[in-house]
From Swiss-Prot:
Protein name, per record: DNA mismatch repair protein MutS
Gene3D superfamilies per the UniProt record, alphabetical: 1.10.1420.10, 6.10.140.430, DNA repair protein MutS, domain I, MutS, connector domain, P-loop containing nucleotide triphosphate hydrolases
Residues holding ATP: G633, P634, N635, M636, G637, G638, K639, S640
Function: This protein is involved in the repair of mismatches in DNA. It is possible that it carries out the mismatch recognition step. This protein has a weak ATPase activity.
Molecular function terms from GO: ATP binding; ATP-dependent DNA damage sensor activity; damaged DNA binding; mismatched DNA binding
Length: 883
């Protein structure tokens, strides 16, 4: 590999060409980042950067001569294709420094002036082409402070929208919080040791970035204030440190202040229903268990008409609310949108109001991200055109909201849509109806906006009459009937004469280009006119660029109202999508109460019911008198689906959505836990059973009477007795100590005796029936325990060979004839005295120790070396040990 020269000062650069000296200085500034070095129509990379980029992007690796006596490896990409290459590099976890030409090549005596204008990292993407439309890509920073009582401060910024949040938690909760936020990049101090799983990119910055005084000063300077009291973060010192470091890093990547970041939102621990990473995965909120994006709860509900709405819906699903008031505000807004609901019925008629609202939302682009790019001065001309058209569509949207005035939240959102009329008028006057893709192409500023630009454009483009007249005069003057006056980008304007007519060319014709069948000439008159036209084109483009910068300056004052408008549009879109789904699929508004309770009548799994022809609805009741359901039944009977169904209905209710049921009542929940299925964590060195116990331990440690807990087949990864003992003990602990609302599925039928001892537990089962053709799963939840598990019948349906099925059936009959082993049945007998249990365990331990000692004595005996007398003595000693 060719290493980049590291010394960038003094004599170390003397042997390099001036251009390479400039490159090496900029590369030293970029550090380990890939440096895209602008040279004309290409971004070039040299030395290790070239070799790395060639490998990652499959580019051709060439050489750019020698500098300081050594060859220079080089690879490049076209400027117009930069975004697609950037996307590939960011997807690979790379960060890129982009160096642009900012000087005038014509005026430069040496290398044209260049500087790094921005840094692109996985967490600082703002370009539309690099961002996922329906998901956020946040940049996060973490800081752990305190030794006796450590606290983890977490800050995260969505640079593409300007949303800036902070929170604090215990260090043990940090991994769960990061999973909730799902940042693309995490910033941490160089010396920080964070032992946690994180799939995104990690970036280390100097420790002093996280120092309290410097971080606070960074925030105060950015928000132009003397105190952080107005942001409600004064009691979050660790979060303030993280926020200051994050803001410093983000501003450096953009090479400018972040004008669209205008506030900090402090999140408190009691704000949301907490979902740990296992629960988010098991409930398949936005990703299936196999890692696919569909079918998930999000893909099912996402009927949003704007990308902003889709992103907000995703955030709502990952952040269900704990308090009822904001949930009821959303729910009431959805109900108001469904004004065509027929009284006393569970179905919805066609809602013309809702369709009108959703049609109006179709007219809106991603204003949230456009506003951010306006602030960052990276907005493209066509985005401004789409913003202009969107502002023109606001009155129609306002009109469609008038019937929703009965909803306080809808009224608030309608008021938030109001925009100053000046911005719409400015964009309508300034931006061409169909602008070019980039400002460098011209044609962006509308005709009539600037008289000087109009004059330059006329001079540059209205030369058609002159060329026609010149061609006619030259034909008459030379007698060459097929003479033509034309233009191309390489040679400019020229007069073309065929080879057979060149003897008629006048003396004032100067040859410009020779072709196979023609010669091309220039005359003094045509040259003078060409200079004037090309100069006008250059001046026109320069004027247009200047006007575009002035336009961005004028738009900067509207970033805040644009962001507020985008936020209102996103929420209206999300509410309308949820309302439309409720209307189409017979969902109902759940009743929200203060106590911890879940009461569902004829509930349905929102995703599964759309995937099968007929879904069997089931109810569920969990409250103060019925805190645990012990669920038994056959494999494939629907236990896991039923449990997920209950959790998803509860989660939907806490987001403000309607739910798939005929009636539902859901109380205030603080957490939702799931332990449904498991797989080996090979990378972490943990078996399935270890994973299962780790998840169970987390649930037992953190669940409360306001938690919903789903436990599926706990204890199955070990021996029967161990598994049964653990399952019983875990269920008993959840019921009597944690007192969480629990769905506990099991194949250990001994556990069905628990309700006899603890009245707040109840047995239910998934029904099945046997027929001549085998087992039939009814998928109905019925009261009471199951009578059997039908494991052999399920194996038969799975295609296990008939001989194996017959042998298994015979073995089952033999085991059933023997009856259940006494120790297993008696293991949890309520009348069993605790002292007897303790004595039995002590005796077992003593027996085990004696057997171990006996084994050691036997191993120590070498029969070949013993005399008959010694052998007889050894035998007596062993007999004495046994008796």
């Amino acid at each position: 590999m060719s290493s980049t020269p590291k010394q960038t000062t003094g004599d170390a650069l003397a042997g390099h060409t001036p251009m390479m000296q400039q490159y090496l200085r900029l590369k030293a500034e970029a550090g380990p980042l890939l440096l895209f070095y602008r040279m004309g129509d290409f971004y070039e990379m040299f030395y290790e950067d070239a070799e790395r980029a060639a490998r990652l992007l499959n580019l051709t690796l060439t050489k750019r001569g020698n500098s300081n006596g050594t060859p220079i490896p080089m690879a490049g990409i076209p400027v117009h294709a930069m975004e697609q290459y950037l996307a590939r590099l960011v997807a690979l976890g790379e960060s890129v420094a982009i160096c642009e030409q900012i000087g005038d090549p014509a005026a430069a005596k040496g290398p044209v002036e260049r500087r790094i204008v921005r840094i692109v990292t996985p967490g600082t993407l703002t370009d539309e082409a690099l961002l996922p439309a329906k998901a956020d890509r946040a940049l996060a920073a973490v800081c752990v402070t305190g030794k006796r009582e450590p606290r983890a401060g977490l800050a995260w910024l969505n640079l593409a929208s300007g949303a800036f949040h902070v929170t604090e938690c215990a260090p043990a909760q940090l991994e769960s919080e990061l999973h909730r936020i799902a940042p693309a990049e995490l910033i941490q101090a160089e010396s920080a040791e964070l032992h946690m799983a994180f799939e995104g990119a990690r970036t280390r910055v100097p420790d002093w970035h996280f120092e309290a005084d410097g971080a606070r000063a960074q925030l105060l300077a950015h928000f132009k204030t003397d105190s952080l009291g107005g942001f409600d973060v004064e009691d979050m010192p660790a979060a303030v440190c993280a926020a200051g470091a994050l803001l410093r890093y983000a501003a450096r990547t953009q090479s400018q202040a972040l004008a669209h970041v205008q506030t900090i939102a402090a999140e408190r621990s009691g704000q949301y229903v907490l979902l740990d990473p296992v629960t988010r995965r098991n409930l398949e909120l936005t990703q299936t268990l196999s890692g696919e994006e569909s079918p998930t709860l999000f893909s099912l509900l996402d009927g949003c008409r704007t990308p902003m709405g889709s992103r907000l819906l995703r955030r709502w699903l990952h952040h269900p609310l704990r308090e009822n008031e904001p949930v009821l505000a959303r729910q009431h807004a959805i109900a108001t949108m469904l004004t065509a609901r027929q009284e006393g019925e569970q179905t919805f008629a066609a809602a013309g109001l809702l369709e009108t609202l959703r049609d109006a939302l179709n007219a809106f682009p991603d204003i949230e991200r456009i506003a951010a790019r306006v602030a960052l001065r990276s907005v493209r001309p066509r985005e401004l055109a789409s913003l202009r058209d969107a502002l023109a569509a606001l009155p129609a949207l306002h009109a469609s909201l008038t019937p929703l005035s009965g909803s306080p939240r809808a009224r608030e959102l309608a008021a938030q849509l109001a925009m100053p009329p000046d911005i719409g008028e400015l964009l309508a006057r300034a931006v061409a109806s169909e602008p070019a893709v980039a400002i460098r192409d011209g044609g962006v500023i509308a005709a009539g906006f600037d008289s000087e630009l109009d004059e330059l454009r006329a001079l540059a483009t209205d030369g058609g009459d002159f060329l026609v007249q010149l061609e006619a005069r030259e034909r008459e003057r030379t007698g060459i009937g097929n003479l033509r006056v034309e233009f191309n980008r390489v040679h400019g304007f020229y007069i073309e004469v065929t080879k057979g007519q060149t003897d008629k060319v006048p003396e004032d014709y100067r040859r410009r280009q020779t072709l196979k069948n023609a010669e091309r000439y220039i005359t003094p008159e045509l040259k003078t006119w060409e200079d004037r036209v090309l100069s006008a084109q250059d001046r026109s483009l320069a004027r247009e660029k200047w006007l575009y910068e002035q336009l961005l300056d004028a738009l900067a004052q509207y970033v805040r109202p644009l962001s507020q408008c985008a936020s209102a549009l996103a929420e209206l879109d999300t509410l309308a999508a949820l309302a439309e789904h409720a209307r189409r699929h017979d969902w109902v508004a759940p009743e929200l109460i203060d106590g911890a309770e879940i009461d569902i009548e004829a509930g349905r799994h929102p995703v599964v019911e759309r995937a099968i022809e007929r879904f069997t609805p089931n109810g569920c009741r969990l409250d103060q008198t019925r805190r645990m359901l012990l669920i038994t039944g056959p494999n494939m009977g629907g236990k896991s689906t039923y449990m997920r169904q209950v959790a998803l209905i509860a989660l939907l209710a806490r987001t403000g959505s309607f739910v798939p049921a005929t009636r539902a009542r859901v109380g205030r929940l603080d957490r939702i836990f799931t332990r449904i299925g498991a797989a080996d964590d090979l990378a972490g060195g943990r078996s399935t059973f270890m994973m299962e116990m780790t998840e169970a331990a987390a649930i037992l440690a953190a669940s409360t009477p306001a938690s919903l807990v789903l436990m599926d087949e706990i204890g199955r990864g070990t021996s029967t007795y161990d598994g049964l003992a653990l399952a019983w003990a875990i269920a008993y602990r959840l019921l009597t100590h944690n007192r969480a609302l629990t769905l506990f599925a099991t194949h250990y039928f001994e556990l069905t005796r628990l309700p006899a001892e603890q009245p707040t537990a109840a047995n239910v089962h998934l029904a099945a029936a046997e027929s001549a053709g085998g087992i039939v799963f009814l998928h109905e939840v019925r009261e009471g325990p199951a009578s059997r598990s039908y494991g052999i019948q399920v194996a038969q349906r799975a295609g296990v060979p008939a001989a194996v099925i017959r042998q298994a059936s015979r073995e089952l009959e033999r085991l059933e004839a023997q009856g259940a082993p006494t120790p297993q049945l008696g293991l949890f007998a309520a009348a069993l005295d605790a002292d007897v249990q303790s004595q039995a365990m002590t005796e077992q331990a003593e027996d085990a120790a004696a057997l171990a000692q006996l084994r050691d004595q036997l191993v120590a005996i070498d029969p070949d070396s013993l005399t008959p007398r010694e052998a007889l003595d050894a035998l007596y000693r062993l007999k004495q040990h046994l008796t």
